[in-house]
Amino acid sequence: MNIVITGGAGFLGARLARTLLAQGPLALAGAAPQPISRITLVDRAQPPADLLADSRVATVVGDLNDLLRPGPSGTMAIAADTQLVFHLAAAVSGECEADFDLGMRSNLDATRALLEACRTLKTGPTFVFASSLAVFGKAPGQSLPEVIEDNTLPTPQSSYGIQKFIGEQLVADYARKGFVRGRNVRLMTVSVRPGKPNGAASSFLSGMIREPLAGQRAVCPVPADVAVALSSPGRTIDGLIRAAETTDADWGPLTAMNLPALRTSVREMAEALGRVAGSAAANLLDWTPDPAIIRVVSTWPGAIAATRARALGLLPDASFEAIIRDYIRENPDAIRLPVQP
């Protein structure tokens, strides 16, 4: 089986590639398991060294729109024998608010160009689109349902959320026409991400844990009572792979599926940090409001019902403390403070 991962050099893309390579044969859409022959990682940068060293990994470096542009230099990102595409490449929420044109190019134009490239293939590829809970938003003067269901009407309140919702509809229509097998998956906010902060409005939800564990100060830019819907990196990858594996009958409608989320609050996250790493870590948090971040994050839902995902065997993380401990176990070199057993 030949697989393409856009955004393959990023944190989630690289982790997805490692997981696929480690787990062996993949049962695509319920078919008989096939060994993975090649994973092509498409991104603006090279992936980590361990992936480059794997003979099953190919890389394509460049802007996705340029790589898919018709002509001699185009379509490098998707080979004729591609059977599965994970479309993770995106400009993130904060970037899209700061640069409207960047968001439209990265999240809308590139998604349609990739779907068009898949349309030309004779393989009828499975197309797993990484959407976002940002398709749901609280409009000024209005309220969201207390719990967001799979079929709750999206009301995005950011450019990023709108672009992701349009992407969902494009994937659904290309699937309806039989060009691809569509799998729209709404990712929750992923925490704790290792490495450096990115431009997402939700970046602090990793930074407020990651930086204190490294002995560094971190800013929490929203009130402590803000509710958030989170998923660990591992559970997020599980959801993407399960979407690729499930049969059309088990998947159900072409509309998007919410991944399971742990419902918590920023205060509870800080308290979990204190239980794991003590007051030395908790005291490194600076509660400094940022109106721009508050304006975006406060529109997002804090409680998600993932009925379809649960029917596929996917479950939320048990607790945020468990998420922190997973991060510590997976990133021992990034931890500078003593942690409680």
Predicted features along the sequence, with ranges:
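Catalytic helix-loop patch of NAD(P)-dependent Rossmann-fold dehydrogenases
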Residues: 105, 140-184, 191
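NAD(P)-dependent short-chain dehydrogenase/reductase
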Residues: 172-227, 233-235
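Conserved Rossmann-fold NAD(P)-dependent oxidoreductase catalytic core, especially the SDR/UDP-sugar
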Residues: 112-157
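Mid/C-terminal beta-alpha module of Rossmann-like enzyme folds, strongest
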Residues: 239-297, 336-338
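NAD(P)H-binding glycine-rich loop region in Rossmannoid oxidoreductase-like domains
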Residues: 61-106
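Amphipathic terminal alpha-helices
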Residues: 289, 301-311, 315-341
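N-terminal Rossmann NAD(P)H-binding glycine-rich loop of SDR-like oxidoreductase domains
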Residues: 1-26
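Glycine-rich Rossmann NAD(P)(H)-binding loop
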Residues: 191-194, 220-230, 243, 252-264
